[in-house]
Amino acid sequence: MSLPFLGPMSLSGFEHSWFFLFLLVVAGLAALYILMQLARHGRMLRFANMELLESVAPKRPSTWRHLPAILLVASLVLFTIAMAGPTNDVRIPRNRAVVMLVIDVSQSMRATDVAPNRMAAAQEAAKQFADELTPGINLGLIAYAGTATVLVSPTTNREATKNALDKLQFADRTATGEGIFTALQVQAIATVGAVIAGDKPPPARIVLFSDGKETMPTNPDNPKGAFTAARTAKDQGVPISTISFGTPYGFVEINDQRQPVPVDDETLKKVAQLSGGNAYNARSLQELKSVYATLQQQIGYETIKGDASVGWVRLGALVLRLAADALLINRRLPT
């Protein structure tokens, strides 16, 4: 948690927990203070004239005289917590990563169940996704139908991706597996480059956008099928986030014949599961933008352990200052 004027504070993830041994010293000081107060009270009773003591001493000794000591002990406890090095989870933008956006451009994307049609809605949402993705992410674009084509290799140039999205063209058939395998080949090149440079390979993810069932091959477990490609992605450590877009009532006109093109959620859900990714579905442009916003948060940021001791230091300093002020005020109060 983070408190106003204090900063981040946490009671977990301690990096130097052995500092808590200092609390034994703090406890010893507190015990010593109590013993000194008891001894002082005993001396007063032993040597004072009781009649005179009762006439000049207050009926109830002020408890304020103990406040400076209590605050001092509290500040030492707070400083001890700070020295133990508490940490908390901090979300920061990724400096580097590779995301391949793989979009289905088959004829079913002409369906108008999502206005103005599935393709136009997909283009608008994908461009917004590109704009909002954190700058350190390398974004690439692949369009697929019967074959897959790399339109934009991974780059931080968002304009290149958006320009390519505007030029998407419809094509026949749906080879989802081909789209995934093509994305994995692009990522393999990026990974090899990072390893040669002596660095760890950047995290990678495929975002697969489609509305229909794979038609080439018809069996997704075929060596070139979507399920086989998803298993390969998992083996390479590249999760696939799938987005199934459209409604069960979509249709297209082909040769003056109305052909139903219902959205296929189940196939894409299994692709995500097999790859270790997540599956999403959207029935409208607004829902699609919401899905992309969720992905942007997942992909664009990473969670690291951050220092959470600053708040404890500031609070300890504040309590220590109060202890000093209480000591000054205490001199003016009856004891």
From Swiss-Prot:
NCBIfam families (alphabetical): PRK13685.1
Record's signal peptide: none
Bilayer topology term: Multi-pass membrane protein
Key word Transcription regulation present: no
Source organism of this protein record: Mycobacterium avium
UniProt keywords, alphabetically: Cell membrane, Membrane, Transmembrane, Transmembrane helix
Residue ranges of domain VWFA in the record: 98-295
Classification via PANTHER family: LEUCINE ZIPPER PROTEIN 4, SPORE GERMINATION PROTEIN
Name this protein carries in UniProt: UPF0353 protein MAV335
TM helices/strands, residue ranges: 18-38, 67-87, 309-329
Higher taxonomy: Bacteria, Bacillati, Actinomycetota, Actinomycetes, Mycobacteriales
Compartments it resides in: Cell membrane
Family: Belongs to the UPF0353 family.
Location, primary (coarse class): membrane
Pfam families: VWA_2
GO cellular component, one term: plasma membrane
